[in-house]
């Protein structure tokens, strides 16, 4: 195993060099040997758009390391636990360091140590020489290393190679805006004076609902790095957008910085002949005064600043409503069912008012449950339109303590904005303004929306990406928002393969699927009751399509009732936060990741977390799903979620779980790559008793389960091309300690179909009987012929054969089964019943008896040819 590491208290040069080294050693793990500098920690805290592929120190098996790659370090005293690895005989050590005068105590067998501004430069040159490309994200991280160790390419130690490396990285998309935000710079006296002048002139003006800050100054000499001042003023004053206009000699310099999508700094600067990104840009104007440039800027801003976000951007649709005649008691049930705190009340098609949970609870307290909601609903409310600015809605909800704002198109109710919607919007805005959150893969986006097109292009086959774009185009034609959702998106972010593509449509999912089928010429199977469909493409790829919907549960453990809903409500009904991500597929915004519930954070923290505290009460099968995801992904269940599981077990909610649903979850667990770990977790949480009251994970049962994995691996390596239902083998092993009555009871509890129940019982009974016979023979060391083995095991399925091998403690019995599977199972006689017929033997049971006797001879080496078999058949016929 290869490992890339660096010195303790790592800095940006360490980070950049490690990233570069990972391109030269693509199979290596990147591991920090210890702590990092504060600037590094800040980077990891603020960077949410890209999962940096580092392995935790505690997850490394040091005994497996065969090659150690050290960057920016040559001393064992600075690499923590990796020192013993570097000293271990047989370990190959490569060092890349830019301190040639610092001879260390490690004798490298490879790498490069030479004088230049940064270790990252050395490795960047290697990539340039070998023609190895890097992504924009990698280029940015590497540029951070070069800039930090060369003082933004100004230290005396800086070499032409550092400039060349920086140029190469810039050509590959290195983002200098991010670099400048993380590499600290000291202000000169001239910059401090200019900063003071700019702060005095700073004015903020609303433009299209957006506050735009503009500051200006005039100098008779040149002062460099105005961009640094723009960053400082933006942070000091907590500004969304700022424009600096500074006259120096015969030129006017403009610098723009923006944190919000409504202001595209690059677009504004391009009008002045400059350029840049949406978040950072600059321009230089000749032959004009500062006053002239300010005037032109003020005239341009209303044209170039996009209007602030409106109600249409924030509202949830379709709307869940209450009829006017709904009673207070019924209203409480409906508010609880949909997990909302306020709901519009409708008089036919007209909205008559709003009822809140607080009013409902108070009315019930006073014994008014039988009265209709129109007696106590709010009848005065803001009537927002789709184009109502968010700040007006914010003033209403916050200023008047309202829970809900309805949105109307004319007189038709088209959506609602809840207090939660507004808080989430305000939270993302505050997070963005107070402290930048960086998406290294794109531009400084809000916390809960990110661009993941680069991940789609990196991890998905090209035909799949093209297909997803085509789905978005069909959505555009039908004016339907279309999203990839769930586990497919989760695994996309994790870089894991997942061919199960789920698509949610805000609207008629069946119409969407049928339209796709007509466009592409593929098959579609619809389920009108649930609003779902499956699209089967000509190449065999399947896409599951569903109308966005919500679910509610009449009683704990019951099957859900389904209704049409919005994307947000559709995602809220899911089991865990990590499965609530969506990626937009429509052309406008293709590849935008939507995260309502902090799923991205939980993916980064590797945590399984439910969305609400009643999740396991509503659907106890989620308990088993939590364990399955925990073991598959290696993500621990959060402490709070585990406490909720224990509560569901204690309160007996799993007793109400239907057998078929429990069986489905158990089968999925037993089909996992490491089901024994999940079974151990189930045992630890007291879940096995819900399968059968007497089912426990005794030591002998655990031993059988461990053996199952070994025998399945053995069988797979035979390459027989035979499919084995591995879950059946694990199921037989899990229940091996139960008596026959207990096994039958388990099948009944799990509502196994009558046909399959008989099949499982037959497997169990015959398997145990054969195992007992073979064990007895082996224990007595009786002479066992090949034919004995054949007839003992003939007719048993591969699942039963593997179960026998796993359960037996006898090596001799394992040899019997192995011999049968590898040599005996396929042996048949040369002669058939037709040959017996030519001998004049009447058809009937005698045929099977003779053919079995002939087969016995063949198995035992007493009949090698067809003629040998015919002679035996004739002899048996004559003796009859």
Curated annotation (Swiss-Prot):
Binding site for Mg(2+): 500, 502
Reactions mediated catalytically: a tRNA with a 3' CC end + ATP = a tRNA with a 3' CCA end + diphosphate
GO molecular function terms noted in the UniProt entry: ATP binding; ATP:3'-cytidine-cytidine-tRNA adenylyltransferase activity; metal ion binding; tRNA binding
Enzyme category, top tier: transferase
Keywords: ATP-binding, CBS domain, Magnesium, Metal-binding, Nucleotide-binding, Nucleotidyltransferase, Repeat, RNA-binding, Transferase, tRNA processing, tRNA-binding
Cofactor(s) of this protein: Mg(2+)
Keyword Glycoprotein found: no
Binding site for ATP: 487-490, 574-575, 579, 619-628, 632, 661
Residue ranges of domain CBS in the record: 315-373, 377-435
Any one biological process term the GO annotation gives: tRNA processing
Coiled-coil parts of chain: none
Enzyme Commission (EC) number: 2.7.7.-
Family (UniProt): Belongs to the tRNA nucleotidyltransferase/poly(A) polymerase family.
Role played: tRNA nucleotidyltransferase involved in the synthesis of the tRNA CCA terminus. Adds the terminal adenosine residue to tRNA.
Protein name: A-adding tRNA nucleotidyltransferase
Organism this protein belongs to: Geobacter sulfurreducens (strain ATCC 51573 / DSM 12127 / PCA)
């Amino acid at each position: 195993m290869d490992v890339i590491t660096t010195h303790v208290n790592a800095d940006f040069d360490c980070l950049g060099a490690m990233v570069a080294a990972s391109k030269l050693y693509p199979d290596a793990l990147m591991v920090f040997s210890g702590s990092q500098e504060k600037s590094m920690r800040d980077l990891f805290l603020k960077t949410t758009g890209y999962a940096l592929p580092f392995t935790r120190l505690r997850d490394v098996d040091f005994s497996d390391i065969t090659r150690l790659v050290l960057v920016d370090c040559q001393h064992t005293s600075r690499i923590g636990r990796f020192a013993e690895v570097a000293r271990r005989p047989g370990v190959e050590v490569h060092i890349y360091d830019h301190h040639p005068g610092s001879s260390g105590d490690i004798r490298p067998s490879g790498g490069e140590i030479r004088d230049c501004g940064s270790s990252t430069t050395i490795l960047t040159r290697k990539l340039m020489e070998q023609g190895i490309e890097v992504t924009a994200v990698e280029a940015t991280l590497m540029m951070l290393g070069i800039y930090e160790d060369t003082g933004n390419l100004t230290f005396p130690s800086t070499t032409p190679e550092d400039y060349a490396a920086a140029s190469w990285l810039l050509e590959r998309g290195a983002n200098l805006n991010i670099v400048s935000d993380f590499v600290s710079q000291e202000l000169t006296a001239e910059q401090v004076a200019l900063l003071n002048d700019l702060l005095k002139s700073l004015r903020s003006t609303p433009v299209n609902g957006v506050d735009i800050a503009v500051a200006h100054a005039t100098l008779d000499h040149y002062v460099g790095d105005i961009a640094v001042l723009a960053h400082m003023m933006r942070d000091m004053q907590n500004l969304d957008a700022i424009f600096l206009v500074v006259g120096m000699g015969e030129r006017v310099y403009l610098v723009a910085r923006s944190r919000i999508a409504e202001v595209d700094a690059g677009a504004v600067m391009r009008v002045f002949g400059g350029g840049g990104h949406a978040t950072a840009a600059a321009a230089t104007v000749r032959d004009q005064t500062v006053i002239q440039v300010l005037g032109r800027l003020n005239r341009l801003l209303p044209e170039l600043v996009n209007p602030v976000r409106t109600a249409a951007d924030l509202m949830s649709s379709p709307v869940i409503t209450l009829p006017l005649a709904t009673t207070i008691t019924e209203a409480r049930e409906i508010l609880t069912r949909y997990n909302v705190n306020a709901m519009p009340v409708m008089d036919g098609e007209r909205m008559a008012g709003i009822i809140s949970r607080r009013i409902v609870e108070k009315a019930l307290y006073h014994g008014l449950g039988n009265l209709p909601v129109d007696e106590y609903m709010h009848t005065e409310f803001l009537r927002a339109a789709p184009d109502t600015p968010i700040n007006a809605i914010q003033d209403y909800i916050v200023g008047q303590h309202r829970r809900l704002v309805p949105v109307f198109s004319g007189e038709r109710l088209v959506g609602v904005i809840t207090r939660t919607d507004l808080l989430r919007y305000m939270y993302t805005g505050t997070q963005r303004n107070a402290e930048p959150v960086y998406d290294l893969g794109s531009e400084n986006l809000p916390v809960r929306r990110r661009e993941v097109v680069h991940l789609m292009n990196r991890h998905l086959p090209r035909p799949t990406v093209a297909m997803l774009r085509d789905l978005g185009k069909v959505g555009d034609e039908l004016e339907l928002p279309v999203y990839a959702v769930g586990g497919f998106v989760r695994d996309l972010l994790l870089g894991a393969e997942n061919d199960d593509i789920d698509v949610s449509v805000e609207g008629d999912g069946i119409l969407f699927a049928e339209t796709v089928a007509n466009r592409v010429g593929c098959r579609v199977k619809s389920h009108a009751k649930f609003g779902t469909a499956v699209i089967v493409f000509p190449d065999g790829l399947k896409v599951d399509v569903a109308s966005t919907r919500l679910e509610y549960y009449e009683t704990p453990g019951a099957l859900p009732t389904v209704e049409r809903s919005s994307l947000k409500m559709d995602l809220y009904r899911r089991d865990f936060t990590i499965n609530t991500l969506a990626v937009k597929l429509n052309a406008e915004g293709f590849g935008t990741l939507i995260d309502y519930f902090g799923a991205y954070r939980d993916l980064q923290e590797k945590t399984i977390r439910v969305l609400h505290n009643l999740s396991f009460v509503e659907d106890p099968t989620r308990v088993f799903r939590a364990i399955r995801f925990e073991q598959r992904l290696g993500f621990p269940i959060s402490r709070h979620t585990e406490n909720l599981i224990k509560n569901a077990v204690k309160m007996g909610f799993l007793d109400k779980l239907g057998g078929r649903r429990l069986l489905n979850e158990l089968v999925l667990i037993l089909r996992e790559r490491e089901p024994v770990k999940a079974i151990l977790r189930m045992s630890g949480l007291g879940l096995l008793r819900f399968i059968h009251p007497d089912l426990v994970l005794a030591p002998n049962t655990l031993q059988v389960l461990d053996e199952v994995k070994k025998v399945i691996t053995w069988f797979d390596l035979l390459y027989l091309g035979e499919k084995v239902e591995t879950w059946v083998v694990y199921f037989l092993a899990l229940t091996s300690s139960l008596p026959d009555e207990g096994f039958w009871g388990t099948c009944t509890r799990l509502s196994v179909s009558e046909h399959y129940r008989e099949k499982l019982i037959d497997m169990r009974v015959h398997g145990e009987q054969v195992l007992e016979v073979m064990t007895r023979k082996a224990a007595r060391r009786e002479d066992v012929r090949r034919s004995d083995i054949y007839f003992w095991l003939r007719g048993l399925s591969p699942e039963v054969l593997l179960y026998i091998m796993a359960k037996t403690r006898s090596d001799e019995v394992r040899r019997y089964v192995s011999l049968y599977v590898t040599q005996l199972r396929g042996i048949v006689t040369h002669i058939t019943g037709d040959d017996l017929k030519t001998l004049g033997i009447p058809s009937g049971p005698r045929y099977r008896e003779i053919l079995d006797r002939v087969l016995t001879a063949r198995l035992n080496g007493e009949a090698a040819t067809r003629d040998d078999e015919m002679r035996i058949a004739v002899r048996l016929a004559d003796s009859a």
